[in-house]
Amino acid sequence: MSIDPAGSQASRQLPINLFTRSPTDAIPQSTYFIPSAWRRFQLSELINQVLGNTAENGSKPVPFDFLVNGEVLRGSLEAWVKKNRGGDEESQIDVEYVRSVMPPEEAARVEVEDWVSGLSLSRKGYVLLSSYLSHLQVLPLSAAAQSSSALYTLPLPTSLGATSCTWVSPQTQETDILVAAGGVDRQTHVYSIPSLSPDTADAPRELYTLHGHTGPISSVIASSSGKEIVTGSWDGNINLYVLPDAEPTEHQVPADPVSYLPGQGTKKRRKLEKDQEKAPIEGLTDGDATGEGGWRRAPDAVMRGHTGRVGGLVWDKLDSGKIWSAGWDGSVRGWEVETGAAGALRQGPFDKSALCVDQWKMNGTLATGNMDRTICLWDTRQATSLISLTLPTTSPVPSVTCHPTSPFTLASATYSGVVQIWDIRSPKTALFTVSKAQSKLADPNRKVTKNGKVLGERLLAVDWNGEVLVAGGEDGEVGIWRARGE
């Protein structure tokens, strides 16, 4: 089929095979002879005309992106042929088209009185956040643009700070909802929220305090049933906790452990502790506490294997009996939850410290954010596979989140203060880069929080549910964007 629209300047025509993986957007298979000067806009118009997505038909045109050999077409077809085929205009070009990912649109900002350390959008309509103010907060997205008031503010029983957070109870559970936060105090604090209704009279409380680590908690995740919690730590270990069906009546772990932080268990200190009465640790005394602890529980299993800190955890989205961990030792490891056995090992370069990990539900591929300013993809379906693709960034990546339905897009947060949305079919550059500091909603005069904490630019957390994207970090704010990503 030859395309020569009226009024267009004479141009050489190239044989193009247009195809898509979306049945609803498919056009008849044919070789289209298309002017070499055409770019994305003209190609998108052609697809919409064939599909009948025109104003005459009462339909709104759909914007499309076009990929050639796995990379987004960013110029004309002629420019691509000159660059990649040495000017060969006779061979057919296979061009895949996909619905465009629209630029994220900032909707709101919520100020937090300290650095934001963790974010979760796993429960629709709400964002769960943890901060170094030692708070866990629940924010309703519907009211975020008008008010920064949290629906619940849950204080940790320590002033050392919260490092991560997760929803524990499944979406279907509407009462006695469990949430969890990992802390610098080596513990994971699990809270029970009576209801997310603002009219609830009952107050939330800390139900469990999970012990067992010797370093700060770096990541906390929960199973889809809400019955199990897994934590990763700077001590290199991964702990599994099985929550009881009914509230217990006694503790599994004694109160007031001797030391909470790395470096406090030195030989000299242990000798002094033999001669002196045990004293409360600074930051964990009753006077500094902001709440009461829950039932103290020990781990049901400890998974060992990492030779450095555990950077992040993700529950396998295709196999509920498996979890994945990424570590500062450059490895990604798969673990069987029931036995605690290491079922898979992907060892990358030892200097490629992984700070976080997430997984695409569509194909099981893992994505890690790394200290060496890269995002790495790992194919979990091949036992001997290492890094299958690397995306370059400008600074370390402490948080990544894969799109829940698209197998190609993900979002990342970086230490340089930017949020990036990627399409792995075009891995050289991000589709969109958003700087929180340069946003119209940013307050240039806010240098410190009300409690005197100095603010910075590094982002520490990002999450994306396919419709809403949130990010936060040292700037003491949660940025909220509308972003579909399909």
Curated annotation (Swiss-Prot):
One of its GO terms (molecular function) is ribonucleoprotein complex binding. PROSITE patterns: WD_REPEATS_1, WD_REPEATS_2, WD_REPEATS_REGION. Gene3D superfamilies: YVTN repeat-like/Quinoprotein amine dehydrogenase. SUPFAM superfamilies: WD40 repeat-like (SSF50978). Residues 12-99 are annotated as: Ubiquitin-like (UBL) domain. InterPro entries: NLE, WD40/YVTN_repeat-like_dom_sf, WD40_repeat_CS, WD40_repeat_dom_sf, WD40_rpt, WDR12/Ytm1. GO terms for cellular component: nucleolus; nucleoplasm; preribosome, large subunit precursor. GO terms for biological process: maturation of 5.8S rRNA from tricistronic rRNA transcript (SSU-rRNA, 5.8S rRNA, LSU-rRNA); maturation of LSU-rRNA from tricistronic rRNA transcript (SSU-rRNA, 5.8S rRNA, LSU-rRNA). Residues 249-299 are annotated as: Disordered. Pfam families: NLE, WD40. It is found in: Nucleus, Nucleolus; Nucleus, Nucleoplasm. Keywords: Nucleus, Repeat, Ribosome biogenesis, rRNA processing, WD repeat. WD repeats lie at residues 212-251, 305-345, 349-388, 392-432, 454-486. SMART domains: WD40 (SM00320). Disulfide bonds: none annotated. Its main location: nucleus. Component of the NOP7 complex, composed of ERB1, NOP7 and YTM1. The complex is held together by ERB1, which interacts with NOP7 via its N-terminal domain and with YTM1 via a high-affinity interaction between the seven-bladed beta-propeller domains of the 2 proteins. The NOP7 complex associates with the 66S pre-ribosome. Interacts (via UBL domain) with MDN1 (via VWFA/MIDAS domain). Component of the NOP7 complex, which is required for maturation of the 25S and 5.8S ribosomal RNAs and formation of the 60S ribosome. Belongs to the WD repeat WDR12/YTM1 family. HAMAP family: WDR12. This is Ribosome biogenesis protein YTM1. The gene is YTM1.
